[in-house]
Regions:
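Active-site catalytic microenvironments for nucleophilic, acid-base chemistry
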Residues: 81, 185, 314-315, 319
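Hydrophobic/aromatic-rich transmembrane helices and adjacent perimembrane loops
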Residues: 303-318
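Aromatic-enriched
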Residues: 317-397, 465
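Transmembrane helices and adjacent periplasmic/lumenal helix-loop junctions
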Residues: 168-185, 297-305
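Hydrophobic transmembrane alpha-helices
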Residues: 83, 98, 175-178, 182, ...
Length: 465
């Protein structure tokens, strides 16, 4: 097959961009060396092959250990069958598959319109986002959880609600943060899906308690209440409301009353905006807002947790294709989320510049929660939603026949037709023979890493005395 000049130019551009992205992701950000996946593998290996508890395991020479709910360890049991390098390969493939599904849900129709070139450029740009590249290089599970949650959004929006809630339930059993999506299902008046999510999460938790009773008892009575096991609240990678208050109060403890007030305000804004989105049938917008609220409300939101911002970015870029100002805003936010800017205040987040700069991703998340364009169903609804709901119903047999307009007496489209884009024009399109045109976190770490390579960890905590 011969390539046209345009195709050759596009191919060269993609190859150059992919090379630059590969070099950047391999050298500029400090390599995380699959650290979190090493924790998962080591904890499961210690449990299965050495009879220990997953919560007693520590990476040799560190205080880093397993911090997820017990079902997360049960779901990772297959790791015990592999060596570390095979487990890394499997984890990489899972993250790639999750990323492909997330892209399909968020931008599948647009990517199909732009073909291989649009897909290649999108993948390269996605790989530059700090939350995405950190999820891959740490061997984290965030993209898999996002895929599970968006899978439920897809089921609800395509009339396959029978299994909706399973993904959210599994995600909540693996990590607590996605449980907020169960509340969204209640706001959406989807009690069956919410019940399914609760049932799946409860069943998974009971299964884990049966498989590992001692570890489950320890987690639910002690570990779940101890945030110091996860990391220091004031560490710069913690881009949550709690992180802002902790850095502001450092070295004192952050005010619980201040956090409660801020959390209530965020909850109020989230409920208000999510209900507006749902009222307009904007399912993707409601799920995007919920991901933003989850990042803000969680006690600890490491930078790699911010993959929950991907639905919001997809909406912003999609709306930006119609409103240039939003496209500029989306581009600026994208650059900031690629920049690792918060690490400039790694050693000292004091002063006004520290308050503003070290919390950059928090301000982005807050701004999106307040200003994300939702409630505009025809624009923000996912493509698979538009196909199932925007198709005009077939005319009733009893419907009166439409009288074509006389060429000398053109009819004006109704206001409803103008609003919906279904104004009736001449019956035949003569441009192409009558054919119409197509419509266009798993561990605490040392308080101060001793070297730049140790800064690679996304989260730190005071080591046990």
């Amino acid at each position: 097959m011969r390539l046209t000049g345009t195709d050759r130019g596009r191919l060269l551009f993609v190859l150059a961009l992919a090379t630059a992205v590969a070099v950047f992701t391999a050298t500029v950000p400090l390599l995380r060396d699959w650290f979190d996946l090493r924790v998962y593998h080591g904890a499961v290996d210690a449990w299965i092959h050495h009879g220990g508890s997953v919560y007693d395991y520590r990476v040799p020479g560190t205080a880093y250990g397993f911090t997820y709910p017990p079902f997360a360890a049960v779901s990772m049991l297959p790791m015990a069958l592999f060596g570390l390098h095979a487990a890394i390969a499997v984890g990489l493939l899972l993250n790639l598959a999750a990323t492909a599904f997330v892209l399909h849900v968020l931008a599948g129709e647009r990517l199909r319109r732009h073909g291989w070139f649009g897909l290649a450029v999108t993948v390269c740009l996605l790989a530059l986002l700090e939350p995405v590249r950190d999820t891959f290089s740490f061997g984290q599970v965030n993209l898999v959880l996002l895929a599970l949650v968006l899978g439920d959004a897809w089921l609800l929006s395509t009339g396959r609600a029978r299994w909706a809630g399973v993904g959210i339930g599994l995600a909540a059993a693996i990590k607590l943060t996605p449980a907020i999506f169960i509340v969204l299902l209640l706001l959406a008046r989807r009690p069956r899906a919410a019940g399914t999510a609760v049932g799946v999460a409860a069943t998974a938790t009971v299964l884990a308690a049966w498989v590992m009773p001692g570890a489950s008892r320890f987690y639910w009575t002690e570990a779940v209440w101890d945030t110091t096991r996860i990391g220091r609240l004031d560490y710069v990678s913690n881009q949550s409301l709690q992180g802002v208050l902790a850095r502001l109060a450092d070295p004192a403890e952050p005010s619980r009353a201040a956090w409660a007030l801020a959390a209530l305000a965020v909850l109020g804004v989230w409920v208000w905006r999510a209900r507006r989105a749902l009222a307009a049938d904007d399912v993707l917008g409601a799920f995007a807002l919920t991901g933003l609220a989850a990042c803000l409300l969680s006690p600890i939101t490491w930078v790699h947790h911010l993959v929950w911002l991907l639905p919001s970015l997809a909406i912003l870029f999609g709306e930006g294709l119609r409103r240039r100002r939003l496209l500029w805003i989306a581009g600026c936010l994208y650059v900031l989320l690629c920049s690792s800017v918060v690490w400039l205040w790694f050693d000292d987040a004091s002063g006004i510049d520290g308050f503003v700069g070290s919390n950059t991703y928090v301000w982005i998340t807050l701004g999106l929660l307040l200003g994300l364009p939702v409630g505009q169903a025809r624009v923000n609804r996912p493509p698979w939603r538009r196909r199932t709901r925007d198709t005009a119903p077939a005319p009733s047999p009893a419907a009166p026949a439409r009288v074509p307009a006389s060429p000398s007496q053109p009819t004006e489209p109704s206001s409803a037709a103008m609003a919906t884009g279904t104004a009736v024009g001449p019956a035949v399109d003569t441009r192409r023979g009558g054919r119409s045109e197509p419509t266009g976190s798993t561990r605490p770490a040392a308080p101060k890493p001793q070297s730049s390579s140790e800064r690679a960890s996304s989260y730190t905590a005071k080591p046990p005395a």
